[in-house]
């Protein structure tokens, strides 16, 4: 029982990191979550240990824990996928070439979207208003409003409401 309470204290002490982002004052962001170059709408609730990069998120969204949204892509059409051949700034000091490549595509999440624990959302994906993404889903395609998706890779399960 003591271990349970100690784990809760450690979890709460884990800090969150918000960089270059706008979080509405009514939104909730749990410990361990990183939000980078993003905006989060009103009354949106984000669970523990999420990573959200280059994302616009609407109002009234609910996100579980351990979710990954956005992130860098790599140039699979180039000779190498390494970032040492790209001109974008990153943590690598010496670059070998200066090819242009957009590493971070903007991800759009509509209003009232529910994303379950452990989901992965690829950068550049658009998730429509009222959509539901199941836990552990790997979303690589756009999701229309009010659709329910799950699986790896994620696929449409059904519409949220009858038409």
Predicted regions and their residues:
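Conserved G/P- and acidic residue-centered "switch" motifs that form tight phosphate/ATP-binding loops
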Residues: 133, 151
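Flexible, glycine/small-residue-enriched loop-and-beta-strand segment within the central core
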Residues: 6, 10-13, 35-40, 45-125, ...
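Extended, small-residue-rich solenoid/repeat segments and analogous flexible loops
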Residues: 1-34, 84
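Glycine/proline-rich loop-helix segments at beta-alpha junctions forming the active-site rim
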Residues: 129
């Amino acid at each position: 029982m003591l271990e349970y309470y100690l784990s809760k204290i450690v979890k709460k002490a884990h800090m969150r990191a918000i960089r270059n982002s706008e979080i509405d004052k009514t939104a909730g962001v749990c410990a361990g979550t990183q939000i980078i170059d993003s905006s989060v709408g009103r009354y949106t609730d984000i669970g523990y240990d999420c990573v959200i990069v280059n994302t616009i998120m609407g109002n009234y969204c609910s996100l579980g824990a351990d979710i990954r949204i956005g992130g860098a892509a790599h140039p699979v059409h180039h000779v190498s996928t390494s970032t040492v051949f790209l001109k974008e700034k990153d943590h690598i000091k010496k670059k070998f070439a200066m090819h242009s490549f957009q590493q971070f595509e903007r991800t759009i999440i509509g209003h009232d979207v529910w994303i379950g624990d452990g989901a992965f959302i690829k950068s550049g994906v658009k998730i429509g208003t009222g959509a539901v993404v199941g836990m552990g889903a790997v979303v690589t395609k756009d999701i229309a409003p009010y659709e329910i998706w799950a699986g790896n890779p994620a696929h449409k399960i059904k519409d949220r409401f009858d038409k």
